[in-house]
């Protein structure tokens, strides 16, 4: 279960009280449709009593994830950043993800002391930073960001599903499931599909109602 060990270690190393250590994570990296969404979050106090049930978003049921989301968004400072499909196709998914992370961090509007990012690559940022592999299972700040990003993107894909029900984005959230792929070949691609992601380059048919 994630805790404040990483945050406390960093706080001690920079020798500053009440420092702002921000966790960052993204959702939608491998999806065929929809934006990549990043969240940035930090806790105003490092109290282990407030982190019960905060886990990597992938380890929570949808119902539990919503419950935890409602709790953590009331006790953390947080922000969301998006990179849309056009930016993904233009800049590639890694650079677009880093762009979304930068936007999420800028949205906090505060003096950040340190940034910790889930994964093995960290974007070029104007703050001290480090990447932490499996960070959403280690750092509670990253785990909180993971949940916020996941719930935000899921809600968006569920909304898009109402416009394009053929692709079942309410279920697959834009990822390449069997049904999604079959629907792509049957109905064509939409403006929300990533044209640089296989098999999209080979699909010329465009969606029309």
Curated annotation (Swiss-Prot):
Q: What is the reaction catalyzed?
A: Endonucleolytic cleavage to 5'-phosphomonoester
The record's InterPro entries line, in alphabetical order, gives: RNase_HII (IPR022898), RNase_HII/HIII (IPR001352), RNase_HII/HIII_dom (IPR024567), RNaseH-like_sf (IPR012337), RNaseH_sf (IPR036397)
Record domain RNase H type-2: where: 19-209
GO cellular component annotations, sorted alphabetically?
Answer: cytoplasm; ribonuclease H2 complex
Descriptive protein name: Ribonuclease HII
This molecule's function is given as: Endonuclease that specifically degrades the RNA of RNA-DNA hybrids.
PANTHER family xref list: RIBONUCLEASE H2 SUBUNIT A, RIBONUCLEASE HII
Q: Which GO terms describe its molecular function?
A: manganese ion binding; RNA binding; RNA-DNA hybrid ribonuclease activity
Q: In its UniProt record, which GO terms are filed under biological process?
A: DNA replication, removal of RNA primer; mismatch repair
How cofactor binds (record note)? Manganese or magnesium. Binds 1 divalent metal ion per monomer in the absence of substrate. May bind a second metal ion after substrate binding.
What subcellular locations does the record give?
Cytoplasm
Q: Which residues bind a divalent metal cation?
A: 25-26, 118
**Cited HAMAP family:** RNase_HII_B
Entry's family note: Belongs to the RNase HII family.
Catalytic activity, EC:
3.1.26.4
Cofactors needed by this protein, per the record, are: Mn(2+); Mg(2+)
Q: What is its main location?
A: cytoplasm
**Keywords, comma-separated and alphabetical:** Cytoplasm, Endonuclease, Hydrolase, Manganese, Metal-binding, Nuclease
């Amino acid at each position: 279960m994630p805790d404040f060990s990483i945050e406390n270690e960093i706080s001690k190393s920079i020798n500053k009280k009440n420092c702002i250590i921000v966790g960052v994570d993204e959702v939608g990296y491998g999806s065929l449709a929809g934006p990549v969404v990043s969240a940035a979050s930090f806790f105003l106090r490092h109290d282990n009593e407030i982190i019960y049930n905060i886990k990597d978003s992938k380890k929570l049921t949808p119902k539990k994830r919503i419950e935890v989301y409602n709790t953590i968004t009331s006790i953390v400072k947080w922000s969301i950043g998006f990179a849309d499909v056009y930016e993904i196709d233009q800049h590639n998914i890694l650079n677009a993800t880093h762009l979304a992370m930068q936007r999420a961090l800028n949205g906090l509007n505060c003096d950040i002391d340190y940034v910790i990012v889930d994964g093995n690559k960290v974007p070029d940022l104007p703050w001290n930073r480090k990447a932490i592999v499996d960070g959403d299972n280690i750092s509670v700040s990253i785990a909180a960001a993971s949940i916020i990003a996941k719930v935000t993107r899921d809600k968006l894909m569920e909304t898009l599903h109402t416009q394009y029900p053929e692709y079942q984005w309410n279920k697959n959230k834009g990822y390449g499931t069997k049904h999604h792929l079959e629907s792509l070949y049957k109905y064509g691609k939409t403006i929300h599909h990533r044209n640089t992601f296989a098999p999209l380059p080979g699909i010329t048919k465009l969606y029309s109602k």
